[in-house]
């Protein structure tokens, strides 16, 4: 049975941990507000670019742009993995790494068996996991979310588009956590290349007038669309990470509170038992003197 001193030491340790988790929750909440704003603001722009690309694809021969052209065979795959730089965010990193692992070993098992799967890792957790296991990592961006900037998204987009154009990749997919709510990030994977524009349809689509020509505009719009999509998923992942961390630290703080309650009860019981024992010894000693 633990002594009073042992329980006091443990209570002190739990209180210290509770202060840390409470502070981390407040920091994550502050970061979440800004990250959420950035993610939500990026969505309409990315959506509009996608809509314009769909409208243009109805008017031009998409096979003329190699980034819009499907390959007859998919032998080389690039997986862009977006994870966090730090832990203490629940199952955020574990779930996304599991999804990427499943994607590589099930969906692209044939390509993986021939060393045809490569990785680009944004975030330290995914980078460390796959690097230690000997996977082919083309580029790693550990620490990227400490100084998140559009230039990183542009660099990743230019890397994968260059690989696709040179025939070093037949498909590029991105795996990330999409921010939906504080309690429920959504695991997602999307195909970035080849780009598949959504058909606008004959009715209901916007009737744009293009100058100088749809062909010249689509050549400019395609790389811009790719840059924007990579940037959007990075913003979504960052917001989802802060939400997951805030939720995890809130749970940890509540668990510490419950543990303190249990420890205080144990402390009081042990203290009462010690007092009772001392009283019994005093009474026993007094009786012995009388006898």
UniProtKB/Swiss-Prot annotation:
Q: How does it sit in the membrane?
A: Peripheral membrane protein
Q: Which compartment or compartments is the protein found in?
A: Cell inner membrane
- Cross-referenced InterPro entries: ATP_synth_F1_ATPase_gsu, ATP_synth_F1_gsu, ATP_synth_F1_gsu_CS
GO CC annotation: plasma membrane; proton-transporting ATP synthase complex
Which Gene Ontology terms cover its molecular function?
A: ATP binding; proton-transporting ATP synthase activity, rotational mechanism
The protein's matches in CDD domains, at most eight in alphabetical order, are given as: F1-ATPase_gamma
Per its UniProt entry, which superkingdom is the organism in? Bacteria
Q: What is a biological process (GO) this protein takes part in?
A: proton motive force-driven plasma membrane ATP synthesis
Alphabetic keyword roster: ATP synthesis, Cell inner membrane, Cell membrane, CF(1), Hydrogen ion transport, Ion transport, Membrane, Transport
Q: PANTHER family given for it?
A: ATP SYNTHASE GAMMA CHAIN (PTHR11693), ATP SYNTHASE SUBUNIT GAMMA, MITOCHONDRIAL (PTHR11693:SF22)
Can you tell me which family this protein belongs to? Answer: Belongs to the ATPase gamma chain family.
According to the record's subunit comment, the protein's assembly and interactions are: F-type ATPases have 2 components, CF(1) - the catalytic core - and CF(0) - the membrane proton channel. CF(1) has five subunits: alpha(3), beta(3), gamma(1), delta(1), epsilon(1). CF(0) has three main subunits: a, b and c.
Protein's job: Produces ATP from ADP in the presence of a proton gradient across the membrane. The gamma chain is believed to be important in regulating ATPase activity and the flow of protons through the CF(0) complex.
UniProt name for this protein: ATP synthase gamma chain
Where does this protein come from, organism-wise? Chlorobium phaeobacteroides (strain DSM 266 / SMG 266 / 2430)
Q: Taxonomy-wise, where does this protein's organism fall, top ranks first?
A: Bacteria, Pseudomonadati, Chlorobiota, Chlorobiia, Chlorobiales
Q: Which gene encodes it?
A: atpG
